[in-house]
Amino acid sequence: LIKKIYKLKIPLIGICFGHQVIAEALGGKVEKSSRGWGVGVHRYERKLNPKWSKIVGNYFFGYASHQDQVVIKPKNAFSIYGSSFCPNSILCYDNLENPIAISIQSHPEFKKDCLEMIIKRRIGQTIPNKVGNKALDSLTEKIDNEKIFKPLLGALRVI
């Protein structure tokens, strides 16, 4: 279905699992990170400079909650933002300035309370205590969700 939508040039956006599914469907590779959980507030650095990314800036802080991630991007994808933990955090497809699809590993749709609840439910179970406590401590950082959504949707020409 993703390949069909992509071939029809229908704008497509993927968040977290959607980011991973789009990448795999279009020829990338997703794996569980050898570094474990990426959870809490993470900083992502700009790697390429499409016009729409100037609104976001050279870096942004976003909410992470994942083990799996895109380890090999599809040939038709550009990695716009990444970190040492997650090198392919934002991918755009086909065209740097006017992409058909954009996907993001972090969670611009989350509010602090949502991620805090997820971490607290998983800490000591699926998320190791040390990682979970560090993630909870990171939630005091200011995140940039507001400045992420509009440029992503604008790049897809849906707003």
For the regions a language model picked out, list residue spans one by one.
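Amide-donor transfer/coupling interface in amidating biosynthetic enzymes
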Residues: R46-I159
